[in-house]
């Protein structure tokens, strides 16, 4: 059986390689937090492993001074 070879183009990560990931930049951080306040996985957010680690650290740093909530329990 011949499988058809489909060429596909890998989607680029939403953050460029030169963009800084900072805990003060809430507009960029909020893209990677779910509605419930959880950190999105790398598969969902399409970040590279290095960017995912940096984003996780930035989100956790933003939670400490209450810039970002730990949980969002708005029902």
Swiss-Prot record:
Residues 1-12 have a biased composition (Basic residues). Pfam families: Ribosomal_S18 (PF01084). One of its GO terms (cellular component) is mitochondrial small ribosomal subunit. Residues 1-21 are annotated as: Disordered. It comes from Cycas taitungensis (Prince sago). This is Small ribosomal subunit protein bS18c. One of its GO terms (biological process) is translation. Belongs to the bacterial ribosomal protein bS18 family.
